[in-house]
Amino acid sequence: MEILQLDGLEPQLFNLIGPLAMNPKVLRANNNYPFKTTERFQWYIAVEDSDVTGFVPVEQKSGGYVINNYYVHNDDQEVLVELLGAVKPKNNLYAIVQTKHEAIFSNCGFQTEPRWTNYIKMIYNTNKNE
């Protein structure tokens, strides 16, 4: 498996992600919430045998970095762990996590913050002195 890192408006991003982001099954897996990107995003894309098996977009915001929509084919834990391991923020990393993926994010060092019905806010603190 290869993890690609692409800027939010790179043409290659749209070629890789477009077919998935417009696929009704993928949108259902994301609770029918559309995927979005701007120049403030970095995308981490898992590719295996020329197929995209998952992606994690990370948005840079004033308080840190945010993962708020991601996709992994068949909820493959190994792919999600690899994608999360590729993300190396310089600041706090927040994630809005689907409840079914809470244990995976927790095992990758994220801590639970507020819990909602379908999602959990989690944080990975990159400043070890806090």
Give, region by region, the residue ranges found by the protein language model.
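Short amphipathic alpha-helix that is part of the acyltransferase structural core
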Residues: M1-N30, N129
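Active-site rim helix/loop that mediates acceptor-substrate recognition in acyltransferases
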Residues: M22-V47
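Conserved beta-strand in the GNAT
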Residues: I45-E59, V66
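Active-site beta-strand termini and strand-to-loop segments that position acidic
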Residues: V47-D49, I123-T126
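A conserved beta-turn-beta hairpin within the catalytic core of GNAT-like acetyltransferases
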Residues: E59-N68, R115-N118
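Conserved acetyl-CoA-binding loop-helix of GNAT-fold acetyltransferases
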Residues: H73-K90
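Conserved GNAT acetyl-CoA-binding A-motif
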Residues: K88-K100
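Conserved active-site alpha-helix within GNAT-family acetyltransferase domains
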Residues: T99-N118
